C-alpha cells in the first residue's frame, strides 16, 4: 500500500510540475517574485577547509542587525517561502536569532528555514538551534526548521579536509545532540551534507553507512568552484578530479541515483554523473529567477556559484530596483549561457529536478498512449 501511495504521489507531482517545466531552461519574462533566499550572514568561519578558501581572505564587516532590519522593511520580500542561513559559519553570529526574527516577521509566507553549519562547536550550534526554535515557535507558517551539517569523511579524513584536528568527532557529537532535540521538536529536521571531491570519492559508501547508523538522511553534492563564495578557483590543482578519479566519481553518482528514492535528488545525481565525464548540465535550477543570494555585506547575487557579477547592494538600492532592473536581467542571461551549463551544484535543485521528473513522467505517460513517442535517455 505504501508503494502504491508513493507512486500515486509521484505521478501527481509529475503531472503538476509538467505544466511549469518549460520555464526552467529559458529566460522567464516577466521576472517573477522570488520564493527562495540564501542569506550568507557572515564571512567568518572557524574551519580551514581545503575546498573553500573563504577563511584565508580579509573581508569587510558583516551587515548589522539594524541594516538587516532596514533591508527587510521592503515588502518585496513577502513572497519568500524558503530561507537558508549560511556563511562562513552562521552560528558564529551571536545575533543570529535576531536576524531570523527580522526575516520571519517580514516574510509571512515563509514555511521552511534551513541552517547550514559545519557542526564544529557543538554547544554553540545547539544553543543557536534552541534559540532559533524558540523564535519560530510562535510563527505558525514555518513548518520545518532544517539543520544541515557538513560531513565529508570518516575520522581523520574529515579532519584533513576541514583543516581542524578532532573535527569529525565534534560533528558526530553535534549530530547526536541534534538527534535528541529532534525527538522532542517535530518541526526540527536534520540532514547531513557531503561534498564529493578527489580526497573522499572512495569514502562515499562509508559516509552512507555512518548516516544510516545515525538515522539521518545524507545528500552528496559535487565540488563546485566559485571565485567569490568559496574563493577556491586559484591554486586548486589538488581539487580537480584526475581522469580516473572522475570516472570513479561518475560511477558513485550513478549508484547514488539508482539508490535514492527521491525524484529531485535522483535526477541531480544523474546529471552529476554525466558532468563528471565532461557533459554539460541537462537542467538549470531556479536561481536568479525564483531564488537569490544576499551576502554578508548586502550584495545581491543570482547564485552563489556565479558571484563575479552582482545585481547591486541593498544598502544602496531597494530590492525592487535590483531585482527587476535591466542590469539584473543582463546578468541572468549571461548566467544561463555561461555559468549554468557547467555548474554541478546540488544546491537549489528541488524545483528544477521535480520539473525534469515531471517531464520524464509525462512523456512516459504519452508513450503508453502513443508507442511512437520518443524514449527519453537519462
Language model features: what each stretch is:
Residues 3-145, 227, 354-356, 364, ...:
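Conserved alpha-helical substructure of the radical SAM core
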Residues 2, 6-7, 140-297, 301, ...:
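Radical SAM enzyme [4Fe-4S]-AdoMet core and its adjacent flexible, acidic
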Residues 89, 117-119, 151-153, 194-196, ...:
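Short, flexible loop/turn elements at secondary-structure junctions
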Residues 297-378:
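Flexible mid-to-C-terminal extensions adjoining Fe-S/redox cofactors in radical SAM and related proteins
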Residues 52-55, 128, 161-164, 306, ...:
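Residue-level signal for well-ordered alpha-helical positions
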Residues 46, 50-53, 286, 341-344:
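Cys/His/Pro-rich metal-binding microdomains
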Residues 13-34, 266, 270-274, 310-327:
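Short, charged low-complexity linear segments at domain edges
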Residues 36-60, 67, 75-78, 82-86, ...:
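Soluble, non-transmembrane catalytic domains of enzymes that act on hydrophobic metabolites at membranes
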Amino acid at each position: 500500500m505504501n508503494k502504491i501511495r508513493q507512486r500515486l504521489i509521484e505521478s501527481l507531482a509529475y503531472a503538476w510540475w509538467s505544466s511549469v517545466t518549460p520555464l526552467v531552461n529559458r529566460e522567464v519574462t516577466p521576472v517573477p517574485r522570488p520564493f527562495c533566499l540564501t542569506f550568507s550572514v557572515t564571512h567568518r568561519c572557524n574551519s580551514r577547509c581545503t575546498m573553500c578558501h573563504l577563511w584565508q581572505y580579509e573581508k569587510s564587516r558583516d551587515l548589522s542587525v539594524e541594516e538587516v532590519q532596514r533591508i527587510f522593511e521592503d515588502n518585496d520580500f513577502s513572497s519568500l517561502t524558503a530561507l537558508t542561513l549560511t556563511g562562513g559559519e552562521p552560528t558564529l553570529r551571536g545575533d543570529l536569532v535576531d536576524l531570523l526574527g527580522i526575516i520571519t516577521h517580514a516574510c509571512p509566507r515563509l514555511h521552511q528555514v534551513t541552517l547550514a553549519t559545519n557542526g564544529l562547536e557543538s554547544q554553540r550550534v545547539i544553543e543557536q538551534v534552541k534559540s532559533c526554535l524558540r523564535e519560530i515557535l510562535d510563527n505558525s507558517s514555518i513548518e520545518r526548521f532544517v539543520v544541515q551539517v557538513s560531513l565529508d569523511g570518516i575520522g581523520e579524513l574529515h579532519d584533513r579536509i576541514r583543516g581542524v584536528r578532532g573535527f569529525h568527532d565534534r560533528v558526530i557529537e553535534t549530530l547526536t545532540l541534534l538527534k535528541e532535540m529532534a525527538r522532542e521538536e517535530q518541526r526540527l529536521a536534520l540532514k547531513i551534507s557531503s561534498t564529493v571531491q578527489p580526497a573522499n570519492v572512495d569514502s562515499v559508501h562509508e559516509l552512507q553507512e555512518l548516516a544510516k547508523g545515525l538515522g539521518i538522511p545524507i545528500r552528496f553534492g559535487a565540488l563546485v568552484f566559485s571565485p567569490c563564495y568559496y574563493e577556491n578557483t586559484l591554486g586548486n590543482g589538488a581539487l580537480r578530479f584526475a581522469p580516473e578519479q572522475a570516472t570513479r566519481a561518475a560511477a558513485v553518482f550513478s549508484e547514488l541515483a539508482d539508490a535514492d528514492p527521491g525524484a529531485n535528488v535522483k535526477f541531480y545525481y544523474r546529471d552529476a554523473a554525466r558532468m563528471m565525464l565532461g557533459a554539460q548540465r541537462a537542467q538549470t535550477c531556479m536561481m536568479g529567477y525564483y531564488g537569490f543570494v544576499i551576502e554578508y555585506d548586502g550584495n545581491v547575487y543570482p547564485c552563489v556559484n556565479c558571484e563575479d557579477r552582482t545585481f547591486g547592494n541593498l544598502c544602496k538600492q531597494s530590492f525592487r530596483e535590483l531585482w527587476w532592473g535591466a542590469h539584473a536581467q543582463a546578468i541572468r542571461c549571461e548566467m544561463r549561457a555561461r555559468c549554468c551549463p557547467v555548474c554541478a551544484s546540488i544546491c537549489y535543485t528541488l524545483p528544477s529536478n521535480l520539473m525534469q521528473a515531471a517531464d520524464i513522467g509525462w512523456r512516459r505517460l504519452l508513450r503508453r498512449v502513443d508507442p511512437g513517442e520518443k524514449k527519453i535517455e537519462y
